[in-house]
């Protein structure tokens, strides 16, 4: 790869070619006296940026918001959305282009769309976002990426007084379901059409082609777009469920039109498994609980379809597209869980086997990640660690006997089966207490824990000697950790 200096990055900003109503050009209002806490060489490679640039003043200036990318525009993009099921109106974000990716500076100050917010992000939430996107990428789940984390001593008032930070995140596009909702709510079909054409041409060109992504009928391109987004969203929900990930704030403005995991706020990877686990303590009704995420994904797609109705005024056709969501999700989820259970395919009778395991884990508070990881050890003949994951070891053993009988029916060698299971059952996930340790170190100016976590989370399925503490159960002190929408 030919590495580029910051000043040489290509800055083809296709979003800025949209009509002026879609954004406002601005100078960010970032925190004072910024310091670079961490930069991500893997993410920099995606845009060809030389990691040697991390040590330059220009890098700090750009990714703190004190200077634009050379030759690029800094834009505040407008969108809207439903938050906790209620229409929230106009929102916005700061972004710019680089190397075919959009870069977004979260915490770089207010925009014309900020409403009552202050445009700031805090260290706590910024460290969590920086780590989470890389953790999800390591797990093989579609996600935005993190490029840089800049900190400042500027005070920011949240539930307590915290310090400011700016995290730069990357994606091919930050267009959201709420981007379409914005123009639909304002009854501006021309802008809605412009946005749909932009998304189709750049990311779903197959929707222009009959027999590829374009569906039959007068509005085949728009229906094809909805079908493609529906499929990606269903697959993403299956990915989340399979690793015990709770997003926490699945508002329509946090739903990517590309099927990426977007906006890491009060998320969590489950420790003790609960079917109705709520990771966001602001979610008093449990709207975004773990077991509700797939249905919320579909609810959000209905909001997107409603926004597209002006362009495809055929309710039955729109509904027919959305009716395909459940089958895609179920097939994908069952496929992922088959791998976690060491099954070559998921048969109808395996649904009871899976449901019984999840109920047993729920009733006995088993650790989601470790229980599945230890199944591989059980297949190798070491059943005790798996059974020790449950209070009632006999019940766990009885369930495992059923799985072993199912394994015997396909004749696969135990070592090959266990190795395949290890490739889909992670050993390391970003547990809240690990993120908290990194936050506390970062508050002292120490990025060492971030380095360790990135090392582990980039290879979450492989045991890495010397880091067993990062794969263990959460310590007692972590029981009181809470995350919320306060970032």
UniProtKB/Swiss-Prot annotation:
UniProt cofactor(s): Mg(2+); Mn(2+)
On whether GTP-binding is a keyword of this UniProt record, the answer is: no
Q: Which Pfam families match?
A: SelO
Q: Which of UniProt's keywords are assigned here?
A: ATP-binding, Magnesium, Manganese, Metal-binding, Nucleotide-binding, Nucleotidyltransferase, Transferase
**Residues bound to ATP:** 92, 95, 106, 118-119, 169, 176, 263
Q: Where are the transmembrane segments?
A: none
Protein residues bound to Mg(2+): 254, 263
- Active site annotated at which positions? 253
The UniProt record lists the EC number as: 2.7.7.-, 2.7.7.108
Catalysed reaction(s) here are: L-seryl-[protein] + ATP = 3-O-(5'-adenylyl)-L-seryl-[protein] + diphosphate; L-threonyl-[protein] + ATP = 3-O-(5'-adenylyl)-L-threonyl-[protein] + diphosphate; L-tyrosyl-[protein] + ATP = O-(5'-adenylyl)-L-tyrosyl-[protein] + diphosphate; L-histidyl-[protein] + UTP = N(tele)-(5'-uridylyl)-L-histidyl-[protein] + diphosphate
Looking up InterPro entries in the UniProt record yields: SelO
What top-tier enzyme class does this entry carry?
Answer: transferase
Asked if the record carries the keyword rRNA-binding, the reply is: no
Q: What does this protein do?
A: Nucleotidyltransferase involved in the post-translational modification of proteins. It can catalyze the addition of adenosine monophosphate (AMP) or uridine monophosphate (UMP) to a protein, resulting in modifications known as AMPylation and UMPylation.
The UniProt family comment states: Belongs to the SELO family.
- Identify the NCBIfam families for this entry: PRK00029.1
Q: What is this protein called?
A: Protein nucleotidyltransferase YdiU
Organism of this sequence: Bordetella pertussis (strain Tohama I / ATCC BAA-589 / NCTC 13251)
Q: What is the lineage of its organism?
A: Bacteria, Pseudomonadati, Pseudomonadota, Betaproteobacteria, Burkholderiales
